[in-house]
Amino acid sequence: RDPATTVMTTAAASWSPQPEGLAELVELFRQSTSTEREVQRRIAHRLDAISQIPDYLNYLVLVFVQMTGEEVSTRSVAGLLAKNHLYFNAPRVSPESLAFVQHMILPALSFSDTVLRNVATQIIAVLMQVVKPVNWIDGLSTLTQAMDSSDLNEAEAALSTFAKISEDMPEELDACEIQGMRPLDVLIPKLLHATAHAD
């Protein structure tokens, strides 16, 4: 078993949210759809304060991936905040949090809702930029397999994610191997096939 996978699984298993903090965040995400300027200002101020806690990213990803009883709008806000937090604050994110996100995020590619799947592809693409493809071979391997999924939504989301990664970091992707093959050697024929069969 890949040692990185063991680390990710351990990180996911050993973390659990504080119920009060989780409840507050979910309520903030629910209110974030308000068009009232004062409500938006208060939410932004509170989220800015909460974002300083070390495991803030874990909470965001947990809400996005696991809180299936919440509205799509609530979960998508959490997901987009997770993507932005990763993008703008990567140096502040602990290895444990990165491992937690790596463990949690890939199943989101098979979400039935288009909005949530699109957010998942954005999170995974940014996460790959942060951790680098060579350090997340399991993630690349899962994406490669998902492109052949019988679930067309999952296959399309995986393909979209892979295309974004190859656009953002072609050299890093080209330096990797998955079972003896370069990811781009797998991706390019699939992209050509998808383009040929596009509606």
Where are these regions (language model features)?
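Short, Lys/Arg-enriched N-terminal segments with co-localized hydrophobic residues
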Residues: 1-7
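Tandem repeat protein-protein interaction scaffolds
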Residues: 192-193
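Alpha-helical solenoid scaffolds in large eukaryotic transport, assembly, and signaling factors
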Residues: 9-111, 115, 119-140, 144, ...
